[in-house]
Structure formats: structure tokens, C-alpha cells
Amino acid sequence: WVHRTDNWNSVCLNGVTGAALSLIEDVHERAYYVAAAEYYSRNSILGFTDDGYCTEGLGYFNYGFSNYIVLREELYQSTGGRIDLFDDDKIGKIALYGVNFEIQNGVYPAFADCKIGTGVMPYILWYCNRNLGLGLERYAAEPAWETDVEPVLSATAMRCFPNTASCAVAGSAGRKVDRLRQYFDCAGVLISRHRNPEGTVSVALKGGNNGENHNHNDLGSFVVVKGGEMLIGDAGGPYNYAGDMWTDKRYTFKTLSSYGHPVPCVDGVCQLPGAEARARVARADFTEERDVFMLDLTSAYPVDGLRGLTRSFTYDRSGGGVLIVEDSIDCEWPRAYESALITFGRWSMKGRDCIEIEGKNERVRVRVTVPGDCGFSVTSEQLQENGPEMTRIAIRPDRKIDRGVVRLVIE
């Protein structure tokens, strides 16, 4: 675990180092543990992309980075500040991930292994805000004890005693977070927001690769939030692990494979796992009115004769917000094609070409266009694997496609 670049590095280093500093009397022996923690904790930071993005999901960010914070506090206090794991420019970017990853109204994407409804631990942002001078007015005051976020024991214990955050002099607020978007260019993830979060559509769009920590095969996945409710998108999960999820059978689970994500299926073939399956960013153009984000997904689909498959997202902020998803397929010969939507809401057809998805308080409509107006069918399937039940809505053109565009307009 000392060589791992995921949350487990920080979790184990924190536990072992904390135990050593508490129980070992010999100062020289304790120093070995401190030196090892300082050295190997670098692997934890390597697990984040250079723009601060956490590929293993927000839940594991909470778990891993909160343990990193406690480890930092242990080393800082035991060395009188001579060792500071925050002495790295990348730490500030990682800390701001918890702010920048929000879509709107406290709703975050559940990309990778993450439960729907997970939010950032406020204590992480308060601790970093105080120690790094991030200038986040929202996290200027110490947050109340969390009841809606899974507790991390070591971080909870640290709050009971003076620490570098509680003893720090509060800095001035005033950091302005880009309200319109956050583009994690190293990770290939875009958060596009409406100017007004009340009753409007904002989105999260995912590229990256299929070899990430706590990976799902989800290139081209997206999340649509209206107001404070996720209506379409990545369903996250699992809520608990089956043993086979840690083996080469991981992607036999539909909710972890691309089948359980709002991404294409070509001739019945789902996405490949592994880093070779990569969403190459073909276009990233952003203005105050609209954001255009195009991903080349060709490498993810092992389909004979597939010359190209791109997914283009256009997010328009006019009105209440509109997301246009366009899949362009180019094959040597016609292939069956399927697009999918994932939802926890109710769905129904409104006319020949429109799907309505309704949540508890909000609803969106999805207008479908297929090549040559050949017609299409819409079917649904309930999926439940170690998590809440979700609905997969499949959209299939009535004939095979060799070249053309399947378009979804969501508003």
C-alpha cells in the first residue's frame, strides 16, 4: 500500500504513523516512521491529476484526503512544523476540487465508485481554507459536526483537539470561484453551470480513460441536474462491494461496465476497460453563452470496421439551460447502434420523438433525432446491483448505421 496512488495510501500511512507516534517511546524509532510517511505520502498526491481532480470519486476523496490531512497534522505537530505535507503547490488544487466539482445546489457527479448524493466533507474545506489561505468565504467558519457525510474516525478525533486549522489566524475571504464552469483539463472532465442555479439545467461531462482508480467504464458519461435534482446521469455505486468486483469479473457487473452508464453501445459491444480506452478531447471551446466539449471515443469500442465515434456536448445557457448530445458514428459497413439514458426518476413518451423524465420536483424532456429519420425504439430496463434501483432507457435507431449522427436535446 505504500506504493499505491489511491486513497489507501493515505489511510494506511495515517493509521500506522499515528499508532507509531503514540506508542513507540524511542524517538529515533519514531523518526523512521515519520520519514517513511513523509516519503511515501507523495504517492497519494500522484494519484490526483495535476489539476487536482480525484479520479476515484468524491466519496474516496473524502476518505483519502481527510486521512492525508490527519497525517499532515501528525507530522507537523511531531516535528514542530519542520515537516509539512501541505508544502506542495498541488495541494491547493486538490483542496479546491471539493468546491470546483460541484454542479449546483450541493449536487455533485457520482463518477467512479461513489454513492449518489455524496457531497464534500465541509471540514476538509475549512481545514484547507485556514491552512492554505484559500479565501473561501463559505468555509471561513468551522463547520458543524457532519451528520450527512460518512464520518472518518481519525478526522473526527482530530477536531476534538487544537490543530493547525483551529489555531490559525483566519485569512481574508474573497476567492471567486468560476460560476460558469470548471474544466479539469488533465482529467478530461467539464462542469458547465447556468448563471442562475434555481430551476435551471447544469451538467457534468466526463472523458478520461477506463484505467482510473476505482474505475467505471464510463467514457462520454454525463450528468444533468435541474435545480437541485439529478434527473439523468451517472448512477455511481456500488453501495457495497461484491468480491468479484475486485477481480477480472468487475465489468461483468452492468452498473460498473459502460452498459450501466449513459454512453453508446455499438453493435452490442460495450467499452473496453483499461487506460488504452481513452476519450481524446477533440474540441473544448467555452464562452459565456455556451460550452462545446467533443470527445473521440473510438479507442473504447473494439468493433470491426469502426472508423470513428465521437460524442459532442453543447451546453447552452440561454433560457433554462440546454444540453445537446451528438454521437457521430462512421463505420465501414452498417452497425446496430444504441444510446442510453440513466435515471432514478419516472419516464414516459411525449409524442413520437420526445422522452420526458420526471423526478421529485423537476422534469426534463429529451428530443431524439436519428440519421435519415429512420425512426427509433425506446425501451427500459431496471438495474440494481449493490445499490439503489435505477432505470436504463435504451434508444435504438430502427436500422443499422454506417454513417450518421444520433442527437439528444435535453432541456
Regions found by a protein language model. Name each.
Residues 142-146, 151, 240-411:
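CBM-like, beta-strand-rich accessory domains located in the C-terminal region of large
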